[in-house]
A protein has these predicted regions:
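Short, internal strand/loop/helix patches
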Residues: 126-171
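Thiol-based oxidoreductase modules, predominantly thioredoxin-like and allied folds used
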Residues: 106-119, 136-145
Length: 207
């Protein structure tokens, strides 16, 4: 991996064993067993299987329904954000258009609210429509404690505790990865849309 594709903060342990999952699926080998064990440890540590609802009010479990065996993007936002969120969302719309029909088929885009008390499924649906988000991109809400657990588990935190408590100062990164291969990376949400799309394609090409 080149230096421009930095390993997901706090989740670097995912990367070293990624290649072992390319081993044959037809028989059990020590390498496959080790990879399966590593994947399970990562799931237990970083991917709490909390229950969420999307903009269509459909129920999802974070790991089983959103991450497992998929190539995904992850970011955090809130609908009434007037600063960084609209810019990142608009940029992700460009990314989705560049990826075309692979979104919803090979790649799944996921945005999680930082203000679940305000962002109901209906509010998320209106936000998605306003920004032109297409199929294959889900916007999630849920219990405040579950969203906070998710934010911290995924490393969307600021090392400055004071800033971390201010939702208006939230991290504007995008995480992307291939859960099955344990390949994870991150980039700024306002990075060039073509660069983001190509970076996401990188974790697919390694599948």
């Amino acid at each position: 991996m080149d230096t421009s594709r930095k390993t997901l903060l706090g989740m670097a342990a995912m990367t070293p064993l990624a290649g072992t999952l390319l081993a044959s699926k037809t028989r059990t080998t020590p390498a496959v067993d080790a990879s399966a064990a590593a994947r399970e440890r990562i799931r237990e540590r970083y991917f709490p299987d909390v229950i969420l609802r999307n903009q269509d009010n459909k129920k999802f479990r974070f790991y089983e329904d959103i991450l497992k065996d998929r190539v995904v993007t992850i970011n955090f936002f809130f609908a009434k954000c007037e600063e960084i969120c609209p810019l990142i969302t608009s940029n992700l719309v460009k990314v989705q258009r560049l990826l075309g029909d692979r979104v919803g088929r090979e790649i799944f885009m996921n945005s999680f609210t930082l203000k679940p008390e305000q962002d109901t499924p209906a509010a998320l649906k209106a936000f998605a429509k306003m920004h032109g988000a297409g199929p294959g991109w889900n916007f999630f809400t849920g219990k405040p404690s579950d969203l906070e657990l998710l934010r911290r588990s995924l490393g969307f935190t600021n090392p400055d505790a004071r800033l971390d408590q201010d939702v208006n100062q939230h991290i504007g990164n995008i995480r992307y990865g291939n859960e099955r291969l344990m390949l994870w990376a991150a980039c700024p949400g306002q990075a060039n849309a073509k660069y983001i799309a190509e970076s996401i394609g990188w974790v697919i090409r390694n599948d």
